[in-house]
Amino acid sequence: MNHIKWLSDLKKAGLLALGKGVITLLKRFSLVIVTLMMSIVVVLAAAKESPGDHVISFDEPIILMISIGIVVFLLIPPLVMSFFGNLVVRIISGVYQCFIVFTFLGLIPIGFLIPNGFLTILVSIAGTLVSIASVAVTLCIGKNKKDI
């Protein structure tokens, strides 16, 4: 209960004044960050269970790092767009994130082709759910009546 008391004291003092817009921004930003982390985890899971020579594996760390770098690079646009609350930017970000959802959905059947690919399937399903939540939050949270 002490931690709640000092939080309320900070709020009364005016030091903790997070507006509705900041909370909305944090929701969008945090879900995009979680999507980024799920993307990195699915690359690592696929590398762990790689069946052949011409796939991502821990045996070739440079290629693995390049793959993770590409994933991070491709998720920078929705990460940057999560800072903006403009309706047009949110729609563009939502459409971009839909491609990420389709990528995670495409990894689910690929996980069945990998021997012992249960971890890849599990992470892909979790990534799909997080990405769908991110799209929903991006498009629905923070709507104003003047935006409609």
From Swiss-Prot:
Bilayer topology annotation: Multi-pass membrane protein
Record keyword Transmembrane present = yes
Work out whether the entry's keyword set contains Transcription regulation: no
Places the protein is found = Cell membrane
> Which controlled-vocabulary keywords does the entry list?
Cell membrane, Membrane, Transmembrane, Transmembrane helix
The residues that cross the membrane are 29-49, 61-81, 99-119, 121-141
Q: Could you list the residue ranges forming a coiled coil in this record?
A: none
One of the record's GO cellular component terms:
plasma membrane
Q: What is this protein called?
A: Uncharacterized membrane protein YdeH
Say which species the protein is native to. Bacillus subtilis (strain 168)
Q: What is the lineage of its organism?
A: Bacteria, Bacillati, Bacillota, Bacilli, Bacillales
Q: Which gene encodes it?
A: ydeH
